[in-house]
Amino acid sequence: MCDEEVAALVVDNGSGMCKAGFAGDDAPRAVFPSIVGRPRHQGVMVGMGQKDSYVGDEAQSKRGILTLKYPIEHGIVTNWDDMEKIWHHTFYNELRVAPEEHPVLLTEAPLNPKANREKMTQIMFETFNTPAMYVAIQAVLSLYASGRTTGIVLDSGDGVSHTVPIYEGYALPHAILRLDLAGRDLTDYLMKILTERGYSFTTTAEREIVRDIKEKLCYVALDFEQEMATAASSSSLEKSYELPDGQVITIGNERFRCPEALFQPSFLGMEACGIHETTYNSIMKCDVDIRKDLYANTVLSGGTTMYPGIADRMQKEITALAPSTMKIKIIAPPERKYSVWIGGSILASLSTFQQMWISKQEYDESGPSIVHRKCF
């Protein structure tokens, strides 16, 4: 227990889920939704100990009477008061540690506004009084977790997807591409296409039900047109899902139409390229000499890459785009849902990393802008 005293805390604040734990562990101790819920109705029973806000799983379990808000949208914190509540909940209720006793490693999406990391830094030092902190890029951590120093990471979470090419440990910033299309957009899209089937989901609480349907039943088709034809001609692809009130709904082609939007963003009315093309474009922005290594080390990471069939589809799509002789390998580790956190745990426990922390002293001397100098 004694090394627990100084263990760094690793907090991967995703748009959808917050993953937190201790550096050196092989999995996060706490995984909970990045949600803050506030009551929609007036409390009438005195002495119930009702709170004015609920965080994480507690908000999720009381969602029927709450308005749920996600303080992180597209990887960027949009509500700092709620974000502080989530961090407070992480330290004091989930990990049960005093943040002033541990260095804290936070993560963020690449190409985030600079003000975002400055504010994160400021809150850590001024509100939580951490002795040291660091902000790492999510995709870089995923590559660490896969045991590579070269590769291109497609990291797709709930709020943002991005492709980050890394060569011998150096991220290539000019070739990083960001796509604001991820899990939450797919949940919204599934809500929309289920409405066409006559099932109406509208409230923030019902969106969580749709998210569950998405996670349990959706998959990526290898050939979309062919799959659509199969779905139209037989009921072999239909699955049923029981809602919390016992009502059973049936979904068919929605199962693969929903994640297809990752490959065809036009389904969502977006002009962007799909994840396969974004990955290819990212590789093409790199030096011609290193492309071969990137094609052979394409690493998937994040919860939105968990759909069955996504790796095979990526392999097929990138093979079609790349030169015909190129060897293409898509790496989809089974733990990729948490690979950002695992990478953070590895990084924060390296002896060589210890001089990289931003200390309270450095912060006091330079202010929040120190984060741009010390963190990539």
From Swiss-Prot:
<dbReference type="GO" id="GO:0015629">
    <property type="term" value="C:actin cytoskeleton"/>
</dbReference>
<dbReference type="GO" id="GO:0005524">
    <property type="term" value="F:ATP binding"/>
</dbReference>
<keyword id="KW-0206">Cytoskeleton</keyword>
<dbReference type="GO" id="GO:0035148">
    <property type="term" value="P:tube formation"/>
</dbReference>
<dbReference type="InterPro" id="IPR004001">
    <property type="entry name" value="Actin_CS"/>
</dbReference>
<dbReference type="GO" id="GO:0007291">
    <property type="term" value="P:sperm individualization"/>
</dbReference>
<dbReference type="InterPro" id="IPR004000">
    <property type="entry name" value="Actin"/>
</dbReference>
<keyword id="KW-0067">ATP-binding</keyword>
<feature type="modified residue" description="Methionine sulfoxide">
    <location>
        <position position="45"/>
    </location>
</feature>
<comment type="function">
    <text>Actins are highly conserved proteins that are involved in various types of cell motility and are ubiquitously expressed in all eukaryotic cells.</text>
</comment>
<dbReference type="GO" id="GO:0035060">
    <property type="term" value="C:brahma complex"/>
</dbReference>
<comment type="similarity">
    <text>Belongs to the actin family.</text>
</comment>
<dbReference type="GO" id="GO:0005737">
    <property type="term" value="C:cytoplasm"/>
</dbReference>
<dbReference type="GO" id="GO:0030723">
    <property type="term" value="P:ovarian fusome organization"/>
</dbReference>
<dbReference type="InterPro" id="IPR043129">
    <property type="entry name" value="ATPase_NBD"/>
</dbReference>
<dbReference type="Pfam" id="PF00022">
    <property type="entry name" value="Actin"/>
</dbReference>
<keyword id="KW-0547">Nucleotide-binding</keyword>
<keyword id="KW-0558">Oxidation</keyword>
<dbReference type="InterPro" id="IPR020902">
    <property type="entry name" value="Actin/actin-like_CS"/>
</dbReference>
<keyword id="KW-0963">Cytoplasm</keyword>
<protein>
    <recommendedName>
        <fullName>Actin-5C</fullName>
        <ecNumber>3.6.4.-</ecNumber>
    </recommendedName>
</protein>
<keyword id="KW-0488">Methylation</keyword>
<comment type="subunit">
    <text>Interacts with Rab6.</text>
</comment>
<feature type="modified residue" description="N-acetylaspartate">
    <location>
        <position position="3"/>
    </location>
</feature>
<feature type="modified residue" description="Methionine sulfoxide">
    <location>
        <position position="48"/>
    </location>
</feature>
<comment type="function">
    <text>Multiple isoforms are involved in various cellular functions such as cytoskeleton structure, cell mobility, chromosome movement and muscle contraction.</text>
</comment>
<feature type="propeptide" description="Removed in mature form">
    <location>
        <begin position="1"/>
        <end position="2"/>
    </location>
</feature>
<feature type="modified residue" description="Tele-methylhistidine">
    <location>
        <position position="74"/>
    </location>
</feature>
<keyword id="KW-0007">Acetylation</keyword>
<dbReference type="GO" id="GO:0016787">
    <property type="term" value="F:hydrolase activity"/>
</dbReference>
<keyword id="KW-0378">Hydrolase</keyword>
<dbReference type="GO" id="GO:0032507">
    <property type="term" value="P:maintenance of protein location in cell"/>
</dbReference>
<dbReference type="GO" id="GO:0031011">
    <property type="term" value="C:Ino80 complex"/>
</dbReference>
<dbReference type="GO" id="GO:0006338">
    <property type="term" value="P:chromatin remodeling"/>
</dbReference>
<dbReference type="GO" id="GO:0000281">
    <property type="term" value="P:mitotic cytokinesis"/>
</dbReference>
